[in-house]
């Protein structure tokens, strides 16, 4: 009996077991991550076609464009790239305006320069008054002061509480919920194809962490504007001369370290990631240096994508500015994503654009 069983096993190995053949056939029909359809919220467009072809090429071990998993690095700007920036302005601008002019816990304590920065934002969104020249830095210094003294947990809670408020200019959406649904699909697609992606934003790093958390983006993959931190007991002693105790905790200071825009994005990528990205996504001139750094990758094929906010039906948009930017990005050889033409939805079917409203 035993001899007969051994003969049967030998015969199966020679001619091939039907069961084994069935398993092999099943595996052959499984879609690779690069070929599976992830993009249900996109229309067919040049940018999406280019992205899918790129990913298929660089994830194919037989391709001369193949990129090892450890070098599949993608960088994403945040505001206007995967998070709304027109409700009615950037999240961090909206929050500073509230903090300084409306928050009863702080509004009477705000220094004059911080108050002026917040008022400039209010006049910009309510009256259309142009922001002062160099307002990126004016805001950065004001924000550093406005949240100084908060612990990291307190600031995180403050950001999330503001993010839970209804977004001005939309029905059915909170500030934190203002995420471009098609771009979430890009995250899922890249993750399935073993890319590591980083948020590289001009907004405060800890604001970005709070907004990126619901998307499953880890805190250590978020780079942004930074202020100096210190121990709550450190006082004026430099950190290099101070030993933090077990019961102490970190607080924000009013000292700005870096505003993470333009070439500063490249410097931060080099310092914190240590590799040149192969994919880059953005929406403004503040992202061009990051894109160019990516496209200058000497080791691997690379690609850069720019979103254009050209949909004034489902979002708040400046069409003249959008067209101007579109031409710039085409000339720069970036792939252009049109929110109007390429996105089947922006925020989801239950979100409706409405006019901005402001208190009297």
Language-model segment annotations:
Residues 1-9:
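Bacterial N-terminal signal peptides that target proteins for export
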Residues 9-12, 19-78, 86, 100, ...:
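Non-catalytic pre-domain segments flanking phosphatase-related domains
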Residues 15-16, 90:
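Residues in and immediately flanking transmembrane alpha helices
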């Amino acid at each position: 009996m035993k001899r007969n069983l051994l003969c049967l096993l030998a015969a199966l190995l020679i001619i091939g077991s039907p069961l084994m053949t069935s398993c092999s056939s099943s595996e052959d029909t499984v879609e690779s991550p690069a070929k599976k359809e992830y993009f249900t919220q996109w229309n067919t467009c040049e940018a999406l076609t280019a992205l899918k072809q790129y990913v298929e090429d660089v994830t194919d071990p037989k391709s001369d464009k193949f990129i090892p998993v450890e070098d599949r690095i993608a960088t994403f700007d945040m505001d206007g790239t995967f998070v709304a920036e027109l409700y009615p302005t950037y999240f961090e601008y909206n929050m500073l305006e509230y903090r300084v002019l409306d928050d009863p816990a702080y509004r009477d304590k705000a220094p004059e320069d911080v108050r002026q920065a917040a008022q400039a934002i209010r006049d910009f969104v309510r009256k259309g008054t142009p922001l002062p020249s160099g307002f990126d830095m004016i805001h950065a210094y004001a924000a550093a002061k406005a949240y100084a003294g908060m612990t990291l947990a307190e600031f995180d809670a403050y950001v999330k509480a503001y993010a839970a408020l209804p977004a001005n200019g939309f029905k059915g959406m909170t500030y934190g919920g203002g995420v471009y649904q098609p771009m979430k699909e890009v995250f899922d697609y890249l993750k399935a194809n073993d890319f590591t992606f980083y948020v590289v934003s001009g907004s405060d790093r800890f604001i970005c962490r709070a907004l990126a958390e619901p998307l499953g983006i880890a805190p250590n993959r978020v780079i942004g504007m930074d202020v100096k931190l210190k121990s709550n007991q450190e006082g004026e002693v430099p950190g290099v001369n101070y030993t933090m105790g077990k019961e102490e905790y970190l607080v924000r200071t009013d000292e700005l370290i870096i505003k993470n825009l333009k070439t500063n994005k490249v410097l931060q990528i080099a310092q914190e990631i240590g590799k040149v990205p192969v994919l880059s996504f953005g929406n403004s001139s503040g992202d061009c240096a990051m894109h160019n750094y990516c496209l200058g990758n000497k080791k691997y094929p690379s690609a850069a994508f720019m979103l254009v906010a050209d949909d004034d039906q489902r979002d708040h948009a400046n069409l003249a500015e959008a067209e101007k930017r579109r031409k710039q990005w085409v000339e720069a050889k970036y792939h252009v994503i049109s929110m109007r033409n390429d996105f089947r939805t922006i925020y989801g079917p239950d979100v409706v654009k409405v006019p901005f409203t402001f208190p009297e």
